[in-house]
Amino acid sequence: MSDAEWRVIEPALPPPAWKSGKGGRPAEHCRRDIVDAIRYLVKEGIQWRAMPCDFPPFGTVYDVLDRWEKSGATERMHDELRRQCRIAAGRRPEPTAAIIDSQSVKAAETVSKDSRGFDAGKKVAGRKRHIAVDTIGLLLTVLVTAAGVQDRDGARPLLWNLRKAFRTVQQAWADSGYAGKLVTWAKTRLKLKLQIVPRTELHKFIVLPRRWVVERTFAWITRSRRTVRDYERLPAHHETIVYWSMIIIMSRRLARNNQSHQLHPT
């Protein structure tokens, strides 16, 4: 992680417990080293026990990742960087529209049987990640379920979380797999207009309006090797890994943007 990226991430990190009056002793390891280790794990897809000796012990890094996930710190950090990216792109800090979709990924042997399933359509045994993104492809929320969960069933808690976190979102786009009662449910329960973008021709590649944005986000996420397959015992940990994959992308984008402004001030 470059110095420019650290300057972007550091203000968004949760304050240390010993500084916020919650007690405890000062941390033994530098927070930048902890963040570097998490980013390395997510980007390179290594096993926890294969953490290089240049980083803090893997147990320490795992404890921090788990603590930030349970406290919501990772999601808050991600949300702050997303707001900065939207402002840098000339958008409002909070989105008004979203696109939803799902992606099934194979599960490693570390994934318990009760949290995995089989996606008959994609012929994938593992888990399914349901995501909502804004109109420029930045992640809004993610939900991980067993791969056997139907898109419509997974979309309900996803849209519920979306509405709870973003009161500004008024419309969402989805493919034909989400058609049916979900559209009515979203309108009556969430006051959200869910618009279905149908595929015009089967067995032919066509760039669908709005739909390509979420597909590009999936491509961004899978640049991080830890997300290509699900290795996490807990679905919540895989959700955290997805957030971290986007944190890496957004921090690099913001760092480049800041450096560009320094070189060419307006």
Briefly describe each language-model feature range.
Residues 1-266:
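Short alpha-helical elements
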